[in-house]
Design a protein with these regions (language model features):
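Hydrophobic anchor at the beta1->P-loop junction of P-loop NTPases
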Residues: 271
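Accessory nucleic-acid engagement/destabilization modules that flank
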Residues: 2-217
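N-terminal pre-P-loop "Q-motif" helix
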Residues: 238-267
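Conserved lysine of the Walker
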Residues: 279
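Conserved RecA-like ASCE ATPase "motif II neighborhood" in helicase/translocase motors
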Residues: 334-403, 583-586
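C-terminal accessory regions
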Residues: 411, 581-686
Length: 686
């Protein structure tokens, strides 16, 4: 036994971390506090005046002098100074987790362990949401903090009014993240000692840990929340995954906005990027930085993806309301500032028909600009829906004309996706360039130098303006670095190979997905059990299916019941409308542009593997009918492409067994699909 009587040093080759003479004095203050509001060695922390520690915390620009927060810190500082005696290591208070837009109460580095500690002041029980929260913090460090990839992380939840601990067990998952320990205050020290006794390994390099890069890949909802809360600039840098690409592009767009404002210019920018590079993130950054209605450079992000707009607006509105309540302020009834800078493009377009006035926004961002309608599609819509005959503009022409009503200056930012099929009635990005060339010579064009690539289908149109006045090609308007999910970078290639019936390529790509589990099953209950087991913390899981999957009803999957994407994506585990309940299935229309961590992809007879290729079907009346139109076949194939690429961390594919007694669901409709997927190498759940 060690002289301190706490640790059996024979079991710990790295020595006793309770009474050893290890020193962290050589860690510079800059490193210590780079991600935390306060950082010091445990010895320095214990000897410091509590008022001086509180003063350092209160100096942070994000500090909010809420009475409850102040009281919590005072209590936590006193508690930690008392309970960390004879322990050596590093301590951080209010450690920032940018992806989640929040901070960990305490991070402790002792021996081979990173302890992630969260207090729930005044709580007598261990709420599931609180357990998930501290678990999420540990998972975030494990996945995105480089020096935490190979270390043991132990989350500890302290309910300050609890009388008994809920869980003192040490249970680790394969990646070294332990299940949260749930303790009352008197059990905190024992939990630390128990973990140090039972977790072996080399001591942490505490300097390296402090210096290590944090490289998160946020979902679009997480990114929007952080950008809105932090007003853009700093938050977007946190998401840059160690690359300068996003920051450089965002800075260039800000320069063009300022130049247009100062010099009374009208500018249209075309931003390109590889799939998953963060084009929408840049658009959100512009919109959130210029979100205030009284800002002369007020901006709006426009998207034709209705569910995406609804989910983003609801997420930001909920966060803003929570922030106000935390500060003791009451949200204004009926007020929704988020609506001012994230809108559906069709609502924006409709405003242009109401009067001759310019839009309220001088900066307008069009997401997926290549999906704007052609002149024929726009004219047909205007005639049928708006009673406007003989409409002569394409949607790009009409939208530019609306923004051009500003007499002084304006900026349009077109976010351009490449490599995507142009659907019926969509004009492609070339229509925007052509509209400026033919109708708006007073507008200058700043074009990504990559817009000439074949995947953007604009080469011919770009050629007509290449030497024109007021046309500038800019390398900084291309995002070259993918920010796809940390586990899912090869998933799109795998799905493409599966859908293109390239078996060998699919097998090879599947072998690269060693951190992205994929399974198939004929049993829906097994699929549900699988995602519930795989998910940790608040990782979201959900049930998804094709909008043409009409014969999953015997499995209680009825896609005709419209799922509300706001509740499905944002609500918690106790809400029956949330994805967690695995009762409501979302279709490709509700999930496009959004993600879950774990998905159950339900496969129906609308898209069947047959022989050496796919068979396409639409359920009409009481039977399946063949889909012969090539365009509609492509829609169906792309629906499954969307479904199979929605999960960030893994998925299980549910292929029903069918029913010989049901002519709409014979086993033959499903067996060949299941066999094809199994032959590729996807593991089978039995």
């Amino acid at each position: 036994m060690c002289p301190c009587q706490f640790i059996n040093t024979a079991a710990l080759p790295w020595a006793c971390w309770i009474c050893s003479n290890f020193s962290v004095a050589n860690l510079t203050p800059a490193l210590i506090v780079s991600r935390a509001w306060y950082g010091a060695s445990i010895a320095e922390f214990r000897s410091a005046d509590p008022n001086s520690i509180f003063g350092i915390l209160a100096k942070d620009p994000e500090f909010d002098l809420a009475t409850t927060q102040k009281g919590a810190w005072v209590e936590q500082i006193a508690f930690l100074q008392k309970n960390l005696d004879r322990l050596n290591g590093m301590l951080y208070l209010e450690f920032n987790i940018p992806r989640m837009g929040s901070r960990v109460d305490v991070v402790l580095l002792i021996g081979p362990v990173v302890f992630v500690v969260e207090f729930k002041v005044g709580e007598a029980s261990f709420a599931r949401a609180a357990v998930d929260q501290v678990w999420d913090y540990a998972l975030d460090l494990k996945n995105f903090h480089e020096a935490s990839h190979q270390v043991s992380l132990v989350p500890i939840l302290i309910a300050t009014e609890a009388k008994e601990p809920a869980s003192m067990k040490l249970t680790a998952d394969v990646d070294g993240v332990y299940r949260p320990m749930q303790v009352h205050p008197e059990g905190f020290r024992a939990a630390i000692e128990y973990a140090l006794e039972n977790i072996s390994g080399d001591a942490l390099d505490q300097r390296q840990w402090a210096q290590a890069a944090y490289k998160p890949t946020p979902t679009i909802v997480e990114a929007a929340r952080a950008l809105y809360a932090h007003h853009g600039v700093q938050a977007i840098k946190a998401f840059d995954a160690g690359k300068k690409n996003l920051s450089t592009t965002s800075r260039r767009i800000e320069e063009l906005i300022e130049e247009a404002r100062v010099k009374n210019r009208k500018i249209i920018c075309f931003l390109t990027g590889v799939p998953g590079a963060g084009k929408t993130l840049v658009g959100l950054n512009v919109a959130t930085q210029h979100a205030r209605a009284d800002n002369p450079t007020h901006a709006v992000l426009l998207s034709g993806n209705g569910p995406l707009v609804a989910v983003l607006r609801a997420a930001l509105f909920r966060d803003e309301r929570a922030r106000l309540r935390k500060r003791g302020l009451k949200p204004k009834t009926g007020s929704d500032p988020v609506k001012q800078f994230i809108q559906n493009v069709h609502h924006f377009r409709d405003e242009a028909l109401k009067s001759e006035a310019p839009p309220a926004d001088h900066v307008v961002v069009f997401d997926e600009a290549q999906r704007a309608w052609s002149q024929a599609m726009t004219a047909d819509f205007m005639k049928r829906k708006k009673g406007v005959p003989n409409f002569s503009d394409s949607e790009p022409q009409f939208l530019i004309r609306y923004v051009d009503r500003h007499k002084d200056w304006a900026v349009i930012l077109c976010l351009v996706g490449g490599g995507q099929e142009i659907n019926r009635g969509e004009s492609g990005i070339g229509a925007w360039v052509e509209a400026v060339r033919t109708s708006f010579p007073n507008w200058d064009m700043y074009i990504s130098s990559r817009l000439t690539d074949s995947e953007y289908a604009a080469t011919a149109t770009i050629g007509t303006v290449q030497e024109s006045r007021g046309v500038y090609f800019d390398d900084n308007l291309h995002l070259a670095v993918s920010m796809r999910s940390f586990r899912a970078e090869h998933v799109s290639a795998f799905v493409k190979a599966v859908l293109d019936c390239e078996r060998d390529n699919a097998r090879l790509t599947l072998a690269k997905l060693n951190r992205y589990p994929i399974a198939i099953t004929r049993n829906l209950n097994l699929a549900k059990q699988w995602v519930r087991t795989m998910a940790r913390g608040s990782e979201r899981f959900g049930l998804i299916a094709s909008s043409k999957a009409q014969r999953l009803k015997p499995h209680a999957i009825d896609i005709r019941v419209k799922t509300d994407p706001v509740h499905w994506f944002l609500d918690g585990k106790d809400d029956t409308r949330s994805s967690y309940y695995l009762e409501d299935a979302a279709t490709e229309f509700q999930v496009q542009g959004l993600e879950v961590d774990w998905a159950i992809v339900s496969w129906d007879g609308d898209f069947r593997f047959k022989g050496s290729g796919w068979s396409f079907h639409d359920f009409r009346g009481a039977k399946w009918q063949n889909v012969k139109n090539p365009e509609n076949r492509n829609y169906l194939k792309n629906a499954y492409r969307v479904l199979l690429t929605r999960a960030r961390q893994g998925m299980v594919i549910f292929v029903p067994e069918g029913d010989p007694a049901d002519h709409t669901r014979p086993p033959a409709f499903y067996d060949s699909t299941f066999e094809y997927l199994a032959q590729i190498g996807i593991s089978v759940l039995n």
